[in-house]
A protein has these predicted regions:
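A hydrophobic alpha-helical transmembrane-helix feature that marks the membrane cores
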Residues: 1-208
Length: 208
């Protein structure tokens, strides 16, 4: 076998390995989403958990800020565990921790949404829109083969600005409004493209 054939064989093996890694990654994502939905259903039907969370979030001006702060710290820990390439167990622990944190912080948000729209139409529409948006952006990132890692600094800057505005709105008491909501959607779209790009181009194949 000549050098060219060896190179082609190696490239093919790497492509197959990366494709298998991407498949395993999104299987784990699907499992995490199902776990989130099951846990969310349990939490929302357990008043002993739901009521304290809602009271903490909306009982005082700084309650929601405390929840966001706890989620940020917990999310950082979860990502640290999930990024551990030496321990599969640590990766699974990080994933599980993040699912639990997401489920907890969504409880007061869902309760609030149901209070405003008891028919559930708003929640259903938000779920459908989120699913379509995620699927579309993920498909773009996977098929375009473009590396979106350059977006990291912009996303970090946008995240810090958003967090600062949220803190100010809670402390001062002003409403952020529809423009801020739209900006958060744009930021979330950028994060989806960035993370999908990292899965394709940067992550080790053991980090599924």
């Amino acid at each position: 076998m000549d050098a060219y054939s060896l190179a082609q064989s190696g490239a093919g093996a790497r492509t197959a390995t990366r494709a298998d890694f991407i498949r395993r990654t999104y299987l784990h994502l699907a499992g995490a989403i199902l776990a989130f939905l099951a846990l969310e259903y349990y939490l929302l039907n357990t008043p002993a958990i739901t009521n304290p969370l809602v009271k903490l979030a909306f009982g005082s001006r700084y309650g929601w800020l405390g929840l966001i702060g706890g989620f940020a710290v917990g999310g950082w820990l979860a990502r640290s565990f999930a990024a551990n390439v030496k321990s599969t167990g640590a990766q699974y622990f990080g994933l599980a921790l993040y699912v639990v944190l997401e489920a907890l912080i969504f409880v007061p948000l869902i309760v609030l949404a149901v209070q405003y729209d008891k028919s559930g139409t708003t929640l259903k529409a938000a779920g459908i829109m989120t699913t379509m948006l995620f699927a579309g952006l993920t498909g773009i990132a996977l098929t375009s083969k473009r590396n979106f890692s350059f977006m990291r600094s912009y996303l970090m800057m946008g995240g810090f600005v958003a967090l600062g505005l949220i803190v100010l709105s809670i402390m001062i008491g002003f409403t952020l409004g529809i423009v801020f909501s739209g900006a958060m959607i744009v930021l979330a779209c950028g994060a989806i493209l960035y993370d999908t790009s990292r899965i394709m181009h940067e992550f080790d194949t053991s980090q599924h």
